Amino acid sequence: MTSNRSTRSSTKREEVSKNGVEKRELDESDVMKNGKKPVKRAKVSSLPKPVRVPGSAKRINKIPELPTERLNVYVFGSGSMNELGMGEEEMDVVYRPRLNPILSTDKVGVVDLAVGGMHSAALSHDGRVYTWGVNDDYALGRLTKDQKDENGDKVDNDLLEGTPSKVEGALSHLRVTKVICSDNLTAAITDNGCCFTWGTFRCSDGVLGYSDSQKRTAEPTQMRLPEICQLATGTDHIIALTTTGKVYTWGNGQQFQLGRRMLERRRLQGLTPQPLALKNIISVGAGSYHSFAIDNKGRVYAWGLNITRQCGIEVEDEEEGAVITKPTLVDALEGYNVKSITGGEHHTLALLEDGRVLAWGRDDRHQLGIPDNALPETVVKDEKGNNYYLSTPTIIPGLTNVIQVVCGTHHNLAVTSDGKVYSWGSAENYEVGQGDNDEDVAVPTLVRSKAIKEVAIRVAGAGGQFSIIAGIPNASEEPVANGIKSEPENEKKLKTEETSKTDDSPVTDAKPDVTSNGEPSTATSESKDSVLEPSSTTA
């Protein structure tokens, strides 16, 4: 005999528990409440979320969106430690931009990149992170030592380090929208504002640690932070900006780059993110050992190492001014509409909203890109009479329409709105991409090569001894500098230049005259290949 549905649902059933006590199961009438069936509990999402912060602070910053333009990646400089990510194609040095075929638009679809001291990361169109370079402290977010292939054979560590590969683990099913690198650590922001990091921090005594209980980690680990919208890194510290305008810092604080005092014997406390007494911040930046924050009224705050006045703060007491222990207003930047700030080891660059660039700090290797005849009288000389540092933020003459500026240890790159990239500073390892000349580049100079001739550069990164740029290949319109295009015959005049294991041949460089104030002269060079650019090259 079969019973109907209503009969079955109302029939009381009994079951025997483990202790032998009989108990009846609840039928539908037992769980009815106010004549209604219970509401099913919603499934709890397993995806990570930012930490909730008490209070109702208003959001003033947006979580970064994933860029959509797919870019080719070009590398130059020293590659002796796998920094260039060329895989099996080992290269000790590349003098001018060369295509990295592993990261081409049809294979990866890179939309953004980040460069650390000796490693790099690229962000793909689908929000995945690819890393390559030195992995001694797990900055790549994956294991490369003593690894075996599917046949059980050991895989060469250099090959694994030098081949751009995905970061898996906790990021496998997440969508990353921003990635950034320090010297020994990598950090990422997801599309819901979570912050993940991996690697470690170092200090003057060696490895400081990843956390107070862990020396280093190769596994992407979520930080206990509120909703994050921007990250900035120095050599071994991180600054995180929340969507509500708060600033958190952590890492090595020996030079007060964390903006808080710590006893030397308790420096592990610096490995835990802590907020600073700043509010309404809309942008953060960092040099190797100094830090910056910009608030919604355009005021700029700085802290950290200031020995060459890289914080932009002049202090009468020389010893007292060597470090700025807490966030301090940079009066010298009042009146400038600063968009972003970044720094190298001991120098700083600030990008203004109008596309110009300010520079200050150390200048012994032409890090500032300012011609001698345009330097203010406040420039400090060394005992030999050479430029040492400049404490006054000063406009770099002739460099305009800049959309991004990045600093390596002693060199810089600037990307302009017309898709070009300029470099200056130390060329000891050919990190400026100006050919096989290792003399310092005194002023911003156009970077040229056949590989990027028809590429509109969109983003750049500068490391310790190398650089990486990315752009749209086969751009429909050739980028124009100051409204003047290269003459067609320039394409036929190429200067053969040897590189280590590369056959790139650059377009002959143009070298326009420079006036006494550093601006380009209106007189054109005698060379037919010359193009009027915002600055000249250096000998």
UniProtKB/Swiss-Prot annotation:
PROSITE patterns: RCC1_1, RCC1_2, RCC1_3. One of its GO terms (cellular component) is chromatin. Residues 34-43 have a biased composition (Basic residues). Pfam families: WD40_RLD (PF25390). Keywords: Cell cycle, Cell division, Guanine-nucleotide releasing factor, Mitosis, Nucleus, Repeat. InterPro entries: Ran_GTPase-activating, RCC1/BLIP-II, Reg_chr_condens. This is Protein pim1. It comes from Schizosaccharomyces pombe (strain 972 / ATCC 24843) (Fission yeast).
